[in-house]
Amino acid sequence: MDRPIVYVSNADSGEISVLALDESRGTLATVQTVAAHGTVMPMALSPDRRVLYAARRNEPWSVLAFAIDARDGRLALLAEAPLPQSMAHIALDGSGRWLFSASYHGNLLALSPIDADGRPGPATQVIPTGPKAHAMRAAPGNRFVYATSLGGGVVMQFGFDAAHGTLTPMAPRDIAVRAG
């Protein structure tokens, strides 16, 4: 791509806008609009920048994987996989083989596999949380994962085995933090 590409999830229209950024003028130009067929919100980019993942927050809850055209940033639907709930946040681990997701209304975290071609699969691990799970990220080094619960006022900490795709609660799992 000869210029930066910006991806915007449009929840109300159920679309993803692909925009090209002209850095010298500071303007955006529409490249493509892609139907996501539902309330699309959180998005995450694969570490190699070849796949864009987008979570649909209406039923049936799912994650969509779009292949990114290296020439112009256009998206092509690659795959879709179910999610256990409506997810407020998604992220990938450092290897790009695992999708982390957090459900604000479902009070849970989920771990889903991603195959070598970037296609996600159904969640292999679902972890109940306190109220309003909000985000989930791997730490640098990909050995630990941290998640937040807004309603519980905690940061949750897990050991992460990327080879087998397992999250193990650390002791203590929940670290209390101040509200706000």
Name each region found by the language model.
Residues L19-G26, F66-G73, S112-R119, F158-L167:
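Short loop/turn segments immediately following beta-strands, especially the blade-tip
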Residues E15-I16, P60-V63, N107-L109, G153-V155:
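Structural signal for beta-propeller blades
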Residues H37, P84, G130-P131, A176-G180:
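Short loop/turn positions that demarcate and connect the beta-strands within blades
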